[in-house]
Amino acid sequence: MPDAFIETAYFKDLTNRALLYLQAGYAVHFCGPAGTGKTALAMHVAELLGRPVVTLQGNDEYKPSDLVGGNSGMRRKKLLDNYVHSVWKAEESMDSIWYDGRITHACRNGHTFVYDDFTRSRPETNNVLLSVLQEKTLDLSAIQKGETRLTVHPDFSVLFTSNPSEYAGVHVLQDALKDRVITIAIKGLDRESEVAIVAGRSGLPWREAARIVDIIRGIRGNDIKKPSIRAAIMVATILATKGSKPSSSNPLFYQILMDVIGSEISYENDGENNSLLIKRIEMELDKYTPENRK
C-alpha cells in the first residue's frame, strides 16, 4: 500500500506556508480536528527541510526531564600509578552520566523536531520550549551540572501538532507559548483531497474512492469531526483487500459501512444507534450512485 504523502492543492498551500515560516525562523503549529492529516503534513514538511527528524508524542505524564534529558547512573574512574616501582598511587573519581532528551538532541545537532499532540503534555512541562523559541537557548541549569545553557543550532526547526482544546486529554495552550509559534488552522479537508488520500492509501480507483468519500461526507454533514477520513480509508482498504466494489447492491459494502462508521459515531440513546445509522447510510447510498458522481 502506498505510504507517500499525497499532496493536493490544499496541502500544497499549507506546505508552502509552513516552509516559509520555518525558513524565517519561526515554529509552526498545525491545529485541527483528528483525522485531518496534521501529523502526516508535519512529517512531510519536516522531510522537505532535508534535516534529520526527531519526533515526540505528547503525554500528560511527561516531566521537563523527559524532553530535556537528565542524569542516568554514575561513571566510576580509577587510576593506578606504579611509575615508581616501590610506590603505588591510586586516584578514584565518580561522575554522573548525562543523556540528552529528544529536544536537547535536536537543538544541539540542528535537527527538525516534530512534537505531535504536544498539548497533551502539561503546560509546565512544555515551558522548557519558551527559551528555545524566543532566545534560541535551552536552559539546563535545573537539571544538569556543568553545562547550564545550550545554544540552539541555527538549523534547528520545530513543528507542533494539536487537537482543539475541547478534546479529552488536551491542555489549553499557554499564552507564552502561543505567542512564540505561528498556528495554521486545519479544518475539514476538501473533497478532492479526501478522494486523493483515500485512493492513494487504499489502492482503489479514483471513482470508487470518490463514492466512499461522498457517502462518508454525507453522513458527516456539518460535523467536521465524525466520521473522519480515517473511516473512509478503512472502508476503502477493506474493499480493496477483498476485491469488492462500493455498490449499494453489495451487502458486504453495507456491512463494512455499518461496522466502521458505527465504531466512530455514538448516540446518546444507544437503542436508536443502529436504526439512525442505517437510515443515514441508506440515504447516502441512494444519493451517491456511480452515475451521478465522478
Please annotate each region the language model reported:
Residues M1-A210, K294:
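AAA+ P-loop NTPase catalytic core and its hallmark functional loops
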Residues M1-T8, A24, G200-K294:
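Alpha-helical lid/collar subdomain of P-loop NTPases
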